Amino acid sequence: MLVPTVIEQTARGERAYDIYSRLLKDRIIMLSGEINDQMANSIIAQLLFLDAQDNTKDISLYINSPGGVITSGLAIMDTMNFIKSDVSTIAIGMAASMASILLTSGTKGKRFALPNSTVLIHQPLGGAQGQQTDIQIAANEILKSRKKINEILHETTGQPLEKIQKDTERDNYLTAEEAKEYGLIDEIMANKKK
């Protein structure tokens, strides 16, 4: 992936940054692409760095992701909840699967989506092969993950567990407006040009 460079004028001359480093100076973190251990480590490091720098200022986490590994996503979520800084979450494009959990886990009152964003909630996906006992272990782990994810959705949206269980039985795509009504986000960001 080509990462743009930004040139900034300083008293000492010019300084070149990759765009993500420049955004980090403004307390903006971009979560884009599949959530995996490598991405989680990068996002967690940025959250910890910004919190250590100044824990009285908000951190903005922009999310455009198809989701990914549950344990990686939960590590990001735990860090968001651990740090003192409020974490504002903003869906841009798609916040699907584990990314929707991160979106709704932002600080209450500071969870947003752009007007044309899509949010997808569903049950965890997984597969297993091998001996029957190994398959049973994997199936039990998926059931535990589903219960955990549904409890997070219950806590963050206020929806009854039974409704969440039903609504996540299959892929459930929501518009920004539907995500707001469901309680996944607090507001839809308006067009600043109008």
Swiss-Prot record:
Record carries keyword Hydrolase: yes
The gene coding this protein: clpP
GO MF annotations in UniProt: ATP-dependent peptidase activity; ATPase binding; serine-type endopeptidase activity
Catalytic function, reaction form: Hydrolysis of proteins to small peptides in the presence of ATP and magnesium. alpha-casein is the usual test substrate. In the absence of ATP, only oligopeptides shorter than five residues are hydrolyzed (such as succinyl-Leu-Tyr-|-NHMec, and Leu-Tyr-Leu-|-Tyr-Trp, in which cleavage of the -Tyr-|-Leu- and -Tyr-|-Trp bonds also occurs)
Major site of localization recorded for this protein: cytoplasm
Self-association and partners: Fourteen ClpP subunits assemble into 2 heptameric rings which stack back to back to give a disk-like structure with a central cavity, resembling the structure of eukaryotic proteasomes.
Gene Ontology biological process terms, A to Z: protein quality control for misfolded or incompletely synthesized proteins
Protein name: ATP-dependent Clp protease proteolytic subunit
Assigned keywords, A-Z: Cytoplasm, Hydrolase, Protease, Serine protease
E.C. number: 3.4.21.92
Stored NCBIfam families: clpP (TIGR00493), PRK00277.1 (NF001368), PRK12553.1 (NF009205)
PROSITE patterns referenced in this protein's UniProt entry, alphabetically: CLP_PROTEASE_HIS (PS00382), CLP_PROTEASE_SER (PS00381)
Keyword Cell cycle: no
Active site: 97, 122
